[in-house]
């Protein structure tokens, strides 16, 4: 069985379905630090303006006082990649695929199933805090490595931010898809292409119930197709021709 890892997103949209917010034990230490930060501290940590930091501070305070509601993560996150993932009107098989084979890597919650209930928050591995004297990446590394040992065949749709959270020896069987546009024989890639394509790729995997590495090579989605000459055992390249 294939396991997919996807990143979080800064952009969020409140879905209809909500739950009580139950915070994992490993996240409690992070919440304690974030909830104690002033607006000025948060602005520096996030590198945002103080006005925006006020909103984030309120979210942390609400979580600390157990006032937050939680929402299925894949529905709450609404960044460009998430908007290109099929999230509504799923078949029973697609719903099972999404909730059992897709996991989200978070610097606040750890690695969680795609439908895990989470609260509104802003947090990533660039957030400048120390937990028990450790960086966020060091703090989460044992948890992330344990997940990798339990799920050796991972399809990673993660950005470079996560490269050194996992130890290298945990990623020997990992495959990272790469998405490129071809125009007049020239290949290019950029953030927008990649984010849209990640969502479309995951949707195609769900719809086709891909369970083997070889099945990924026959996928055609949003104009992309597998390019064997540019691909390696650990990097599958998908090309889309532009007019």
UniProtKB/Swiss-Prot annotation:
PANTHER family noted in UniProt: PEROXIDE STRESS RESISTANCE PROTEIN YAAA, PEROXIDE STRESS RESPONSE PROTEIN YAAA
InterPro entries: YaaA (IPR005583)
Pfam families: H2O2_YaaD (PF03883)
Name of the protein this chain belongs to: UPF0246 protein Spy49_1742
GO BP: response to hydroperoxide
Family: Belongs to the UPF0246 family.
GO CC list: cytosol
